[in-house]
Amino acid sequence: MGAVTDDEVIRKRLLIDGDGAGDDRRINLLVKSFIKWCNSGSQEEGYSQYQRMLSTLSQCEFSMGKTLLVYDMNLREMENYEKIYKEIECSIAGAHEKIAECKKQILQAKRIRKNRQEYDALAKVIQHHPDRHETLKELEALGKELEHLSHIKESVEDKLELRRKQFHVLLSTIHELQQTLENDDKLSEVDEAQESTMEADPKP
């Protein structure tokens, strides 16, 4: 067991004494001794009562000193309790701050984890696509092919326009030829009619 402190000894004595309950008894005893001392009939009896009063006064002084010590001890304990209370409050406030900081760190860690997952998913998607250099090459080749096809288209359109014009000229020629043939047929019919008329008329 550890050493017993003075405060513990005083506390035990207070418990035994009934927390100062004997002071009233001592005061009553002091008053009775004082009355007996005043009414003493002999010097010996007066001296005896005087010694009792001194003893009772010493006990009262000791009790008062003990009470003051207990009071000071209680004040020190109250100050100590207030100090401990403030330390506990500071510890609680510090714990709340640490909890808030931990929550922020957890949220930040969640965001970092989410960003990392999104980055990994995007990286997988990018890996399935061709390389940028190869894509540029393909785009360049497609551009050249498109340019070549554009030239071919222009050439085909030019040829088609030429054929359209030639067909138009051919149709015009055929139309003129038909007109000519029709005119020739009409002339032949007129000539035949004239010849028939001449053959039908007799010479005089």
Swiss-Prot record:
Ubiquitously expressed. Residues 146-204 form a coiled coil. It comes from the Eukaryota. Residues 105-204 are annotated as: Interaction with NIF3L1. The modification N-acetylglycine is found at G2. Keywords: Acetylation, Coiled coil, Cytoplasm, mRNA processing, mRNA splicing, mRNA transport, Nucleus, Phosphoprotein, RNA-binding, Transport. InterPro entries: THOC7/Mft1 (IPR008501). It is found in: Cytoplasm; Nucleus; Nucleus speckle. The modification Phosphothreonine is found at T5. GO terms for molecular function: RNA binding. One of its GO terms (cellular component) is nucleus. Residues 50-137 are annotated as: Interaction with THOC5. The modification N6-acetyllysine is found at K36. Residues 182-204 are annotated as: Disordered. Tetramer; as part of a THO-DDX39B complex. Component of the THO subcomplex, which is composed of THOC1, THOC2, THOC3, THOC5, THOC6 and THOC7. Component of the transcription/export (TREX) complex at least composed of ALYREF/THOC4, DDX39B, SARNP/CIP29, CHTOP and the THO subcomplex; in the complex interacts with THOC1, THOC2 and THOC5; forms a coiled-coil dimer with THOC5; together with THOC5 and THOC6, plays a key structural role in the oligomerization of the THO-DDX39B complex. TREX seems to have a dynamic structure involving ATP-dependent remodeling. Interacts with NIF3L1. Belongs to the THOC7 family. This is THO complex subunit 7 homolog.
